[in-house]
Curated annotation (Swiss-Prot):
The lineage of its organism: Bacteria, Bacillati, Bacillota, Bacilli, Bacillales. Disruption phenotype: Disruption of the gene leads to almost full resistance to trifluoromethylthioribose (3FMTR), a toxic analog of MTR. Keywords: Cell membrane, Membrane, Sugar transport, Transmembrane, Transmembrane helix, Transport. It is found in: Cell membrane. Its main location: membrane. It comes from Bacillus subtilis (strain 168). This is Methylthioribose transporter. PANTHER family: CATIONIC AMINO ACID TRANSPORTER 4, INNER MEMBRANE TRANSPORTER YGJI-RELATED. InterPro entries: AA/rel_permease1. Belongs to the amino acid-polyamine-organocation (APC) superfamily. GO terms for cellular component: plasma membrane. The keyword Transport applies. The chain crosses the membrane at residues 33-53, 56-76, 102-122, 152-172, 185-205, 213-233, 254-274, 301-321, 355-375, 376-396, 409-429, 432-452. The gene is mtrA. Involved in import of methylthioribose (MTR) into the cell.
Length: 461
């Protein structure tokens, strides 16, 4: 039984972090944009209006502040680990050195499902926006190629979703420098489009629309904070980049915390302007930002925002694929997954085969499977990871006080305990079918560990 809780030696992690198999090219600026790219998708254009109309009213800005603070607690934990143990694998690698092999494998197994389902689900959303854009030009894809079987009448394969994943795969496989350049350009365009809405919309703000400010009471604000919490998920993907970052001890914490801070400011600003442009009760529509712009006669800007939604989703897919590949790379290097996933291309300095295998699987899922309620597993997986890393910080401080970190979580163990408690509360609020799917996936992972990973682990040698 003791082998189930064997821990990876810090010396091994230190040696791996100094390995030159992956190229160190990322700066704090690159990391910040990677995090923003993964967090801000279509949610900022959709969830702001919907939650304002049904849960919080103009006080939605307070909901976003509360949710941002809750996410910050977990972000602090990621920042401390990434500055003290700058290695690929994120919470998998961090829990391996603090909580033991079995739990590390299971949280890695959990994140594998989270990333691939999120990637496929986001690609499906991209497909819908892309088809709507084509329809505006009176162009239409054959019905059989517009969705997965069961998603709509006559659909057999979601071609746009599969194609966009394969295009993103081609970019990511060519090298971190190339994919970073692409991500930076697209994220800056996305931020520019959001700022365009804020600048144009602020001219139409009527303070009377902010009254009553809290129509659903404080209870509505808190419940809405639980809803918008999920709009922040994705910043953890940054921690998978540690081995490709210049001066990771300094730049990793800056990238993680800066990404979360920028996203929080943008969410608050959009919420403030949106609820000021028109009565909050009218915002319960599928595209509230575009709807509000049309409401004030800014149809052209509304069209630009629709294009911005497509751009926004693209960077989310890139960040998710990047995180998935770096996670399986780390697990394979430790012997817990087959060696194929850890092979690095001699020219591109990327896990080339791993990237394409992941991309093809995700494209197949997006093309053929109607994800439905499985999309909730993304939230479950992320919250489980947040809980584990919060606990792991406490263990790290107690078991390895000698580790020097450029960023340290304040008020340990109080902050990590609060972080874990909030995440467990959010997990409890998820549907029963999500819990059932999660338990089944973890059970499958346990079998894989005992049948393969335990025997092939490098710690056996």
């Amino acid at each position: 039984m003791s082998s189930l809780f064997r821990k990876k030696p810090l010396e091994t992690l230190s040696a791996q972090s100094k390995s030159k198999s992956l190229a160190r090219t990322l700066s704090a600026f690159d990391l910040t944009l990677l995090g923003i790219g993964c967090v801000i998708g279509t949610g900022i254009f959709v969830i702001t209006g919907t939650v304002a109309a049904t849960g919080a009213g103009p006080a939605l800005i307070i909901s976003f502040i509360l949710a941002g603070l809750a996410c910050a607690l977990a972000a602090f934990c990621y920042a401390e680990f990434s500055s003290s143990i700058p290695i690929s694998g994120s919470v998998y690698s961090y829990s391996y050195v603090t909580l033991g092999e079995l739990l590390a494998f299971l949280i890695g197994w959990d994140l594998m499902l989270e990333y691939v389902i999120a990637l496929s689900a986001v690609a499906t959303g991209w497909s819908s926006y892309f088809q709507s854009l084509l329809a505006g030009f009176n162009l239409h894809i054959p019905a059989a190629l517009t969705g997965a079987p069961g998603s709509m009448a006559g659909a057999v394969f979601n071609l746009p979703a599969a194609v966009i994943i394969l295009l993103i795969t081609a970019i990511v496989s060519r090298g971190v420098k190339e994919s970073t350049r692409f991500n930076n350009v697209i994220v800056l365009m996305k931020i520019a489009i959001i700022l365009l809405f804020i600048i144009v919309g602020i001219g139409y703000v009527k303070p009377d629309n902010w009254s009553p400010f809290m129509p659903f009471g404080m209870k509505g604000v808190i419940l809405s904070a639980a809803t918008v919490f999920f709009a922040y998920l994705g910043f953890d993907a940054v921690s998978n980049a540690s081995e490709e970052v210049k001066n990771p001890q300094k730049n990793m914490p800056v990238g993680i915390i800066s990404a979360l801070a920028v996203c929080t400011v943008l969410y608050i600003a959009v919420s403030l302007v949106l609820t000021g442009m028109m009565p909050y009760a009218k915002l319960n529509v599928g595209d509230p930002v575009s709807f509000a712009l049309k409401f004030v006669g800014q149809d052209a800007v509304a069209g630009i925002i629709s294009v911005g939604a497509i751009i926004g989703i693209t960077t989310v897919m890139l960040a998710l694929l990047y995180a998935q590949v770096r996670l399986t790379f780390a697990m394979s290097r430790d012997g817990l997954l087959p060696g194929l996933f850890a092979k690095v291309h001699p020219s591109f300095k990327t896990p080339f085969r791993n990237t394409w295998l992941t991309g093809i699987v995700a494209a197949g899922i997006a093309g053929f499977i109607n994800l439905g309620t499985l999309a909730h597993l993304v939230n479950m997986g992320t919250l489980a990871a947040f809980t584990v890393i919060s606990i792991a910080v406490i263990v790290l401080r107690k078991k390895h006080p000698e580790i020097k970190a450029s960023f340290r979580v304040p008020f340990v163990p109080v902050v990590p305990i609060i972080s874990a408690g909030i995440c467990l509360w959010f997990m409890y609020s998820l549907p029963g079918v999500t819990w059932l799917s999660f338990v089944i996936w973890i059970a499958v992972g346990t079998l894989v560990y005992f049948l393969y990973s335990r025997k092939h682990s490098l710690l056996n040698k």
